[in-house]
Regions:
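Single conserved hydrophobic/aromatic residue that forms the stacking wall/gate
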Residues: 1-5, 9
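Ferredoxin-type iron-sulfur electron-transfer modules in oxidoreductases and energy-metabolism complexes
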Residues: 10-155
């Protein structure tokens, strides 16, 4: 897993979590051990949000369904790079555009998955790690990850 797992040992107050691009939300915490499939766990969370959306506002009603479907494909290793890029865009279309905070709450876990578990997403979906630049997949792949993968492939 990424360094996200070690973040649990950091301070768990609202301000400290915001500094780490995280948050307490409703102060509910989900603990997932390393034996679990992290992508499937996030797909399950997305399914909850899709199911529980009241359907009143379009970004939440449609966006939660989109996120769930893409995460299901991602968990099976069937997602394309374009879908994963679109997934981040969908979260940004939901965030700040819903009647209540439920829609935003559905977007934030997905953003966390994309931010903290990129390597798992790339490996599961057989994305080419030897991409020439960040412009090829701007959000999903960080330059340091590309350099690390390139170094491993040379040895």
């Amino acid at each position: 897993w990424s360094s996200a797992a070690s973040d649990v040992y950091k301070r768990q107050d609202f301000d400290s979590l915001v500094e780490n691009k995280s948050g307490l939300g409703t102060a509910g915490i989900v603990v997932i051990n390393k034996d679990q499939d992290i992508i499937k766990c996030f797909a399950r969370i997305a399914r909850f949000y899709k199911h529980e959306s009241c359907g009143q506002c379009t970004p939440c009603r449609e966006g939660s369904g989109w996120m769930w479907r893409i995460l299901e494909r991602m968990a099976k290793g069937e997602a394309s790079r374009e879908e994963v890029e679109m997934l981040f865009d969908v979260t940004k279309q939901i965030e700040g555009h819903t009647i209540c905070a439920f829609g935003e709450g559905s977007a934030w876990p997905v953003q966390g998955l994309l931010r903290n578990f990129k390597k798992e997403i790339i490996k599961r979906n057989n994305f080419d790690p030897l991409i020439k630049s960040n412009k090829d997949i701007p959000y999903l792949v960080d330059q340091h990850l590309l350099e690390k993968d390139n170094a491993q492939n040379k040895s």
